[in-house]
């Protein structure tokens, strides 16, 4: 099968040589202000597009951090960053002071040096909900300023029904908490107490939601609760234990998957079993829905499976391994950006989904193709607009790909200078006649027409030369003015 041409990109790779704190990356996140945060095995690096600023802990720095290895980052509704370290401790980085805050130390009676965080979620009202194993759930609040984080409420584990097994918070500030004893709780926005909605035979493992309901999935059933009043409807499962659930906002449908590979759709007050055409996954581990209503199924098999409700069929995608033999990575992810759906597959495989061809195409990582630039075991990736950030297991470091929406042609200058830096461009300008003027570090000035053919070259300027060209400007008469470094 002929491969599609991948999107044209401009690539850049960053490592410790460029200022990153470590080349092993555990998470990548682009925040609401455009900064890129990179969690590494030795601290956090923040990239502003030009330089890295690193955050970590060293002996004697009085930092509250208990570990220098970071594994995840998220952002609350006020723009503050929340980090999880390797020992499952959680910290807030105040965006204004750029100082870490030990949030769990605010919880009375909790040893902030010895605990394990299991869930950290943000609502839309400045609240962050943190579940602590064996203790309960803390709700923290903050503001869009330099003020420190505060604790708003704490919900004890015995009152909730044991340790938290799944949690969901909405933008309005409501929280839905499922616990080990099979209890489903709801905490309304701003409230200090939890309301028990029902009890289930097995503890819940996941939540999803649509505009009207919150769905709580257990091995035996799906509990549907009204967002406004919390009224509960039980939807019994099938023969095999349920293992995944997702809401598709396009078709307004909720899907559930099972351990034996069955796929269900919520239909009225029951789970209706689907029988798609194609090879059925052996065991469904996760479900995700994209902006076109396609459901992506993660199973025990390498790769990923597409379920299309419009055609009611499965299609499995898998790439040949192109990484080290000892790579093990069972996390999958789909994300949309640059007009494309990006897919990180189970075990190995990374690419974008071509909707017209119904294929997951490799992204510069097929060793059989001449454009291959990287291996295909991606540790983490993040995409925002037309910029894709990723890190591969083998090459390490941080790779940036700027997706070009319009085709671009790259050409080099035919310099006559023996200086290897003579082609380094320092000034660009397009004049009123559509010609592109290029000034170089070595003092060359060249104009190109619309066909990228050189139509003018600045003659030699004596023994001293032109000097490094740093600025170009056209005046109202069409004259071109050249600014140099030290030569006028």
Annotated model-derived regions:
Residues 1-488:
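Carboxylate-rich, polar loop motifs that coordinate divalent cations or form catalytic acidic clusters
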């Amino acid at each position: 099968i002929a491969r599609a041409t991948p999107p044209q990109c401009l690539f850049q790779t960053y490592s410790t040589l460029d200022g990153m704190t470590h080349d092993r990356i555990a998470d990548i996140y682009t925040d609401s202000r455009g900064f890129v945060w990179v969690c590494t095995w030795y601290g956090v690096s923040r990239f502003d597009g030009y330089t890295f600023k690193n955050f970590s802990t060293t002996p004697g720095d009085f930092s509250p951090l208990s570990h220098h290895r970071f594994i995840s980052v998220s952002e609350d509704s006020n723009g503050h960053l929340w980090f999880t370290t390797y020992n499952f401790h959680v910290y807030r980085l105040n965006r204004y002071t750029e100082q870490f805050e030990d949030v769990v130390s605010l919880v009375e009676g909790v040893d902030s040096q010895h605990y394990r965080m299991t869930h950290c979620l943000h609502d839309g009202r400045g609240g962050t909900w943190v579940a602590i194993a064996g203790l309960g759930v803390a709700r923290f609040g903050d503001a869009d300023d330099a003020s420190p984080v505060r604790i708003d409420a704490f919900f004890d584990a015995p009152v909730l029904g044991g340790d938290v097994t799944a949690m969901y918070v909405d933008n309005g500030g409501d929280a839905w908490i499922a616990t080990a004893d099979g209890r489903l709780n709801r905490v309304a926005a701003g409230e200090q107490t939890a309301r028990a909605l029902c009890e289930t035979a097995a503890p819940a493992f996941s939540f999803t939601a649509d505009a009207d309901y919150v769905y709580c999935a257990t091995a035996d059933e799906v509990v549907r609760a009204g967002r406004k009043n919390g009224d509960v409807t039980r939807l019994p499962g099938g023969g095999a234990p349920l293992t995944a659930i997702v809401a598709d906002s396009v078709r307004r449908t909720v899907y559930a998957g099972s351990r034996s590979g069955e796929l269900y759709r919520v239909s009225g007050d029951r789970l209706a079993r689907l029988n798609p055409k194609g090879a059925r996954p052996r065991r469904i581990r996760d479900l995700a829905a994209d902006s076109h209503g396609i459901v992506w199924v993660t199973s025990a098999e390498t790769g990923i499976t597409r379920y299309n409700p419009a055609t009611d069929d499965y299609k499995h995608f898998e790439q040949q391994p192109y990484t080290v033999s000892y790579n093990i990575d069972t996390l999958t992810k789909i994300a949309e950006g640059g007009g494309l759906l990006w897919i990180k597959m189970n075990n190995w495989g990374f690419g974008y989904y071509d909707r017209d061809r119904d294929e997951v195409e490799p992204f510069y990582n097929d060793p059989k193709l001449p454009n291959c630039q990287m291996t295909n075991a991606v540790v983490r990736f993040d995409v925002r607009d037309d910029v894709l950030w990723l890190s591969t297991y083998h090459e390490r470091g941080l790779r940036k790909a700027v997706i070009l929406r319009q085709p671009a042609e790259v050409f080099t200058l035919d310099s006559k200078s023996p200086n290897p830096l003579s082609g380094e461009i320092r000034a660009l300008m397009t004049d009123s006649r559509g010609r592109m003027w290029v000034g170089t570090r070595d003092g060359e000035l060249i104009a190109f027409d619309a066909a990228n053919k050189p139509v003018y070259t600045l003659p030699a300027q004596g023994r001293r030369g032109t000097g490094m060209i740093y600025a170009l400007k056209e005046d109202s008469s069409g004259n071109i003015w050249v600014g140099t470094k030290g030569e006028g």
